[in-house]
Curated annotation (Swiss-Prot):
Name under which the protein is recorded: Glycine cleavage system H protein
Cofactor binding: number and manner: Binds 1 lipoyl cofactor covalently.
Keyword 4Fe-4S: no
Function, as annotated: The glycine cleavage system catalyzes the degradation of glycine. The H protein shuttles the methylamine group of glycine from the P protein to the T protein.
NCBIfam families: gcvH, PRK01202.1
Cofactor requirements of the protein: (R)-lipoate
UniProt key word Calcium: no
Pfam families referenced in this protein's UniProt entry, alphabetically: GCV_H
GO-annotated biological processes: glycine decarboxylation via glycine cleavage system
Amino acid sequence: MSEIPGDLKFLKSHEWARVESNGRVTVGISDHAQGLLGDLVYVELPGVGDTVQVGNGAAVVESVKAASDVYSPVSGTVVEVNSALSDKPETINEDAYGEGWIFVVEIDDKEQLNDLLDPDDYAELLEDDDH
C-alpha cells in the first residue's frame, strides 16, 4: 500500500479530500479502496454544476469485481471533473492520490472539513479493518 499523503482528509468510506490553495476541494478514492476494488473498468462522473451533499453518492467506480459509490466528503457544487478517467479509469489504480482524482467541489461550508479523518486517523482505521 502506498504512503498516505499528509495533506489529505478522509471519510471512513475511503474517499479523500484535498483542500486546494483556491479553497476548492479535490476528491478521489484512497489507494486502499482501489486495491480492494481491483482493476477499474468504468467511472461514472458527476456533472459540472451538480450539487453534492456530504456523505451522499456523487460518482461511481466499477471494477471487474464490483461497483461502488464514491461519496462526497463535503457539500457544494462540482466545478471540475477528471474526464480523462472516462477513457482511462485505471488511472485511479495507478495513482489514486494524484492523477486519479475524480472531481473538484466548490465547498459550501469549510467547517465540514473538520469532521473528516486526518491521515493518522485514517491509517488507524485501516489497521483496525485488517484485524
